[in-house]
Amino acid sequence: TGEIGQDVARALRSRGLGRLVVTSRRVERAAALAAATEGDAISFEDWPAVLERVGVAIFATSAPGALLEVETLRGVMERRRGDPLFLIDLAVPRDIEAACGGLDSVFLYNLEDLTAIANENRRLRESEIEKCRLALAERAEHFWLRLRP
């Protein structure tokens, strides 16, 4: 429910994501963000149980260490019976133990992963822009040659 959490929640809602489940150590902050995004607020103690029923969980706390440990997630995943779970860890230090990404049907992304994905996408876009420039230059030259007497 900090600045990052608010920005992410609003961005997801603006892109059509369904109902958000919001939690915070401070209940009033969770309630305010849930109301602003037409979501549901839950107590901070209940977040592990919610992992059993969501498809994506985004962590962005200021906790001094990992909140989600591999043993906890292993139990969650057993109860999910193979349903995939996408975990996005925006926290520094990380909220999710790296070993969680090694569990079956868990897809864990952290800031470094997201940065690498964004950089690759930017590189691909720049490559396509260059292809378009070359195609436009070729067509402009062809058009100019046709106009010459």
Model-derived features: where do they sit?
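Adenosine-nucleotide cofactor-binding segment
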Residues: 17-47, 67-68
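Adenosine-phosphate binding glycine-rich loop
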Residues: 74-149
